[in-house]
């Protein structure tokens, strides 16, 4: 990928991100200037990486040149330093920028410290194009470095993070609410389907029972009340017979032999009561 194409990709990404977060900034009450400041900081960091040439490089380079010239004018205008005593010397060094080591003067100016100047790709020189190296008899040190320093206000970052968190929480609440509603609808739908199935099963059982009662397989002999075997003659304390009370699914007859499929019944055998869910019975009447 060529430098021009790479630069264009970076610029598209920066503009896209800024446009996407603009609405969030407005909702959070953050003005447009803050967004532009963050955009400029991002562009400045990209310029410092020197991965390619960007369209905004000149903007930051002009600002850095003005800062270097102002600092140079301030140092040259320091009281007690005779500018006519400066010696201009050309040196080939690997460091870019302006180097002002050991400015000495007879007046012993109490000035020392480090001055950080942000530079990118611009090399600051005097009018002759040479690096200034001045020596006098005083003790004043001024170190100029080319390391950039980017400061972002923590309160701006905190406000942005709070805005993003609020947006994410609102989205999560809406999603959870929608999921709960869908779950309730599914539960209600399942309950109705179960009720319909139970009704169909109950109706089928009723129809099956009615069909069995209407067939010839079940004769009047089962319903004959002439055999009052529930009443025991000569017994005052109750029946002494083996009794069974249950429902039947199917009854078939072959001559005098009966075969029954019984369910959900109670049976009394030798005066002991038992319950059962299903039973197969064969009986013969003589």
Curated annotation (Swiss-Prot):
Which molecular-function annotation in GO is an example for this chain? RNA polymerase II core promoter sequence-specific DNA binding
Chain residue ranges for the region called Disordered: 120-145, 167-195, 208-236
Gene designation? TOA1
Annotated PANTHER family: TRANSCRIPTION INITIATION FACTOR IIA SUBUNIT 1
Short name of one Pfam family: TFIIA
The molecule here is called Transcription initiation factor IIA large subunit
Q: Quote the biased-composition stretches of kind Basic and acidic residues, using this chain's numbering.
A: 175-195
Q: Where is the composition biased (Acidic residues)?
A: 214-236
Q: Which family does it belong to?
A: Belongs to the TFIIA subunit 1 family.
| Species | Saccharomyces cerevisiae (strain ATCC 204508 / S288c)
Give the location in the cell. Cytoplasm; Nucleus
**Annotated GO CC locations:** cytoplasm; nucleus; transcription factor TFIIA complex
- The UniProt record lists the keyword 4Fe-4S: no
Q: Which GO terms describe its biological process?
A: positive regulation of transcription by RNA polymerase II; positive regulation of transcription initiation by RNA polymerase II; RNA polymerase II preinitiation complex assembly; transcription by RNA polymerase II; transcription initiation at RNA polymerase II promoter
Q: Which UniProt keywords apply?
A: Cytoplasm, Nucleus, Transcription
- Description of how the protein assembles with itself and partners: TFIIA is a heterodimer composed of the large TOA1 and a small TOA2 subunits. Interacts with KAP122.
InterPro entries with a match to the protein in the record: TFIIA_asu/bsu, TFIIA_b-brl
What role does it play?
Answer: TFIIA is a component of the transcription machinery of RNA polymerase II and implicated in the regulation of basal transcription. Interacts with TBP (the TATA-binding protein).
